[in-house]
Amino acid sequence: MKHYGEYKNLFSKLYEESQIQLDAKMSEHIYFKVGGPVDILLTPNSIQQVKETITICKENNIPFYVIGNGSNILVKDGGIRGVVIKLCELNKIECIGNKIIAECGALLKDVSKAATEGSLAGFQFACGIPGSVGGAVFMNAGAYDGEISFVIESAEVLDDNQEIRIIPKSELNLGYRQSVVMQKGYIVLRATFNLVNGDKEKIQARVDELTKRREERQPLEYPSAGSTFKRPEGYFAGKLIEDAGLKGFAIGGACVSEKHAGFVINCKNGTAKDVLDVIYHVRDEVKKQFGVDLYPEVRIWGED
């Protein structure tokens, strides 16, 4: 605990002791398994708790960061000053007719499972995406020719005025790895997905097919944040990186995956600096060789 010990009492009035972690290792909360500690990590179990937590942070000028499953975040080795609000406990999933209503912390694989069990088609693409609903809506996550914009009906968000709003799909401005939620810094609380009735066996078969493909082609045995770079227009990041001769390129304990060049992985107990050094080298080398700019898809937080 570094800078915000004086604020613990503020959060203690709102949280049980078990929901508060001081000087929490962020490496235990993100998929990359790297990064320094955060001053305070809070795990709310209700939307009201989330709202009140952010009010406290804003009133006391405490920096705060919101995570779901930590699958698309890299925390630097110096850690995070302030508060991390982890939404994993807000994970209810409800099926009503051909709609699924899921809270922000629900895992995409669990939403996909619920859809399959309810014989609802359209969410199979997300069966292997390791993120949560909140993060998926935030960045319009996608895979295997599917994305959130294809299935979402609306998102319930906490806006920058601490008001809860329901934003219809038409106003979410969903594009490639972007949304109005990202642009305005809103926090996703729930999402409603509009699916179609289908044949359960066929839906499961598609899930199985995508799961097998992912296992065969991606380095799932190593910590990573999935695809490291956004897809540059007209290209594939992994192909550019491979063509640049960077498969297997390593710095310290991080490297470009031999299995899929689009993944930077923590292959030998690396540090956040190792991961970032690999990312920046890959970016610079692809620019040098092909004149193409690569931008990280992973979000980078914290201090060096």
From Swiss-Prot:
Keywords annotated in UniProt: Cell cycle, Cell division, Cell shape, Cell wall biogenesis/degradation, Cytoplasm, FAD, Flavoprotein, NADP, Oxidoreductase, Peptidoglycan synthesis
Cellular component GO terms held in the UniProt record: cytosol
Keyword Cell cycle: yes
PROSITE patterns for this protein: FAD_PCMH (PS51387)
Domain FAD-binding PCMH-type positions: 33-198
Pathway: Cell wall biogenesis; peptidoglycan biosynthesis
Stated name of the protein: UDP-N-acetylenolpyruvoylglucosamine reductase
Biological source species: Clostridium beijerinckii (strain ATCC 51743 / NCIMB 8052) (Clostridium acetobutylicum)
